[in-house]
Amino acid sequence: MAQHAVYFPDAFLTQMREAMPSTLSFDEFISACQRPLRRSIRINTLKISVADFLALIAPYGWSLTPIPWCHEGFWIERDDEEALPLGSTAEHLSGLFYIQEASSMLPVAALFADDNHPQRVMDMAAAPGSKTTQIAARMGNRGAILANEFSASRVKVLHANISRCGIANTALTHFDGRVFGAALPEMFDAILLDAPCSGEGVVRKDPDALKNWSPESNLDIAATQRELLDSAFHALRPGGTLVYSTCTLNRQENEAVCLWLKETYADAVEFLPLGDLFPDADRALTPEGFLHVFPQIYDCEGFFVARLRKMSSLPAMPAPGYKVGAFPFTPLKGREALHVTQAANAVGLLWDENLHLWQREKEVWLFPAEIESLIGKVRFSRLGIKLAESHNKGYRWQHEATIALACPTHAHAFELSVQEAEEWYRGRDIYPQTPPAADDVLVTFQHQPLGLAKRIGARIKNSYPRELVRDGKLFTGNS
């Protein structure tokens, strides 16, 4: 594999020599950093099983190598990347897989280790959504996830990925993560803090990642990480699990941050060793039981993962100073709720008791039940999924609800051909040889929902959101 020139500050190399265990070769570390990163994907098991996905893509000639710490994760090699980028394939557009670096699948694997089944989870630094969507898949779209992102520009990307993957159990917030310990004390069964860091592990993807690196900046970042971890630990219920991770390699931002928490809260903190997380995990194991993944160990990005348990309750942090404001939604119950549910079921949209109906003026939403106890304690950027807008003639069903809730075997489902599916993704109306009988049509391809549409005569009117429309080649193997 070709190498690329990575910028290494001298002080960084000195620091790595000191941090690296004697069992690892420093020359192999440098060599690994200079190799381009292997691409990897994670199959979205909310939409398709691993076996069915592998059968679906078998004719494409994609070479998939299993990632040992993630059953649904694979390194991928393709010959047609230039003609058809992976992110433009129909399987990606319909949410069947997520393009995710292999190392970044580790934190969620750790969060759910030892048969852990949390019902309310927080992803404290969630964008662009790889770990949030992985958590949702592990939860089977049940329970609830609070996905927080401090960067306003990244919240939109986070929502787009959640929507594409058909996720219904998530609430989005836009806060500095340091507020949650005070705002939502001991409210979560599990928390993932994939902390902002110096990014030393990403040089295989970005050869200039260390251009602005300095030992001083590492210490500044570690101070912020301690505050975020402190907040996360306060927001975790006693007995709950917290995973702290970074994509950096120095000890100040990794082991030292976790040891600081242990020193601060003593017996309230238990380190849960990760040596049995997957075969050969012990090759990256630290004396504390953390995983310090140097890139040459598994031929992936550099990464760090620690798993902690909260053993006892902590004194509350000072109450937050902000005002949440009035909540603009009201529960939809009784006859109204029944009417909405029956109308949705009639077009193939189904949900269970995990989701509750709420209303804001003419908008109808579905909120995860597990998140309702947080209402009034924190301001949400977006909560649950928008199901419909009501109008004089009924309901206008929303695209994100169709992707998350539609039953592809419903009587109104209409399976598109390859050519028709390409037309759909390009935003064009469909003229099938044999039009569907029903006026309300659940459009599917590869037995996955693409949207709800109206039949007008012999034409299926395209309802694909304009902002998602794609041009160019979208399918592997067709002309």
Curated annotation (Swiss-Prot):
What are the GO cellular component annotations?
Answer: cytoplasm
Q: Which UniProt keywords apply?
A: Cytoplasm, Methyltransferase, RNA-binding, rRNA processing, S-adenosyl-L-methionine, Transferase
The residues that hold S-adenosyl-L-methionine are 125-131, 149, 176, 194
Q: Which portions of this protein are annotated as coiled-coil regions?
A: none
Q: Which domain of life is it from?
A: Bacteria
Q: Cross-referenced InterPro entries, in alphabetical order?
A: Methyltr_RsmF_N, MeTrfase_RsmB-F_NOP2_cat, MeTrfase_RsmB-F_NOP2_dom, Nol1_Nop2_Fmu_2, Nop2p, RCMT, rRNA_ssu_MeTfrase_F, RsmB/NOL1/NOP2-like_CS
Q: What are the EC numbers?
A: 2.1.1.178
Q: Which Pfam families match?
A: Methyltr_RsmB-F (PF01189), Methyltr_RsmF_N (PF17125), Methyltranf_PUA (PF13636), YebU_pre-PUA_dom (PF21150)
What the protein does comes down to: Specifically methylates the cytosine at position 1407 (m5C1407) of 16S rRNA.
The UniProt similarity line reads: Belongs to the class I-like SAM-binding methyltransferase superfamily. RsmB/NOP family.
PANTHER family documented for this protein:
28S RRNA (CYTOSINE(4447)-C(5))-METHYLTRANSFERASE-RELATED (PTHR22807:SF30), NOP2 YEAST -RELATED NOL1/NOP2/FMU SUN DOMAIN-CONTAINING (PTHR22807)
Listed HAMAP family: 16SrRNA_methyltr_F (MF_01579)
This protein is called what?
Ribosomal RNA small subunit methyltransferase F
Native source species? Salmonella typhimurium (strain LT2 / SGSC1412 / ATCC 700720)
